[in-house]
């Protein structure tokens, strides 16, 4: 338990709070005294995360969880009210919810999957920014942090939905930062590379793919949720008080090189024949999106 609490008296909401980045970010916030509410869709996951995090919380820091859908505006509003109660206001919000991994050639990507990637990675962040800004402004100002991806800057093939959503997210961060600056609400983003979390565990069973990622990282290792959490903590707190509208990479230097070759994952996902047909401009008939 920490005795130094620079975030004491501040309330925070983290969407996707039960996952790797969400819970790692929460740990650093509560360690520095913030009262944090984790939002997610699975109560058991949230309950276990809160139980683990209590061991690291500074004196007076409160931990809560709220079961709800971050892509639903009404549910999100309820979660924000819950997060504001312990500290008497909301000062920080972190948008972690997202999903990637379609590994499908563009000519085979169905509309439903594409739109779903936008909903989870972009619309969820839009809703959090829109819903969190008024209570943060009412509390005297604060910070909103979004989780982007190095896919926003690098052209990752076969991930059209995910890369489009993350690029859009960073544009949203800039627009929101400009509009909300008079309210003293800062909006920034962290841009991680590949991390080992419960959502990406299946990728770590692909040694050739991991080698592709490692070869493009000058620092020579993959990241952890704790690496990204350090960036979230900086952007959420007063240490970054003169920063807004920024998206910065925490990806081992990957943006200095290029995206990995993902042909193998796409072939595994759709099959060799379909992959080759799509890349030759003759994709199989698309599935019914209805």
Regions found by a protein language model. Name each.
Residues 149:
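Residue(s) in the substrate-gating loop at a strand-loop-helix junction
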Residues 104-106, 110-115, 213:
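Substrate-binding pocket helix/loop in short-chain dehydrogenase/reductase
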Residues 129, 165, 173:
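Active-site helix of classical SDR
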Residues 2, 103, 244-290:
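Short C-terminal tail/terminal secondary-structure segment
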Residues 134, 178-179, 241:
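Alpha-helical segment proximal to the catalytic Tyr-Lys
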Residues 11, 18-20:
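Conserved glycine-rich cofactor-binding loop
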Residues 181, 186, 243-245:
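Short, small/polar-rich loop/turn modules that mediate ligand/substrate recognition or access, typified
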